Amino acid sequence: VVISVVTRQAAIVSKGNDGKILTLNFIKVDFDNDFLDKKYFLYLFNSYSGVKRQKERMLQGTGAVLKIPVKSLNDIEIPIISMSEQVKIGEAYKKTICLNNYLDKYKSLMEKCANSILEESVRGRRR
């Protein structure tokens, strides 16, 4: 898992990226898999309102670029629940993200299709 200090979002990185060097805008998070599920952590860090409020209080910087200081990340309080509940929440979060991605693609295709039909209608009427 890596955290972008600029976007303030966490993501799971594929094993193909093991050993790569991170820029200063990213922080690697190591896990004790018996204690905290990675997908549950992603949900908490990216979407859970309690953690969002904590992150907002920690922001530093000027202008458009506000970042979370690395030292502040250790102070974020993560609600720990049973591992089975963490896994359920993490899987539900992953499915929600996947569904949103599919819906975004569908929306884009629908817009392209509609625009194509409308443009063709305009071209056909000009003749």
Residue positions per predicted region:
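Short, surface-exposed recognition loops or helix-turn segments adjacent to catalytic cores
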Residues: 56-61, 106-109
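Short amphipathic coiled-coil heptad-repeat segments
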Residues: 102-127
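Glycine- and charge-enriched low-complexity intrinsically disordered segments
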Residues: 38-59
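Generic structural signal for buried aliphatic residues
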Residues: 1-3
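Amphipathic alpha-helical segments
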Residues: 37-42, 71-108
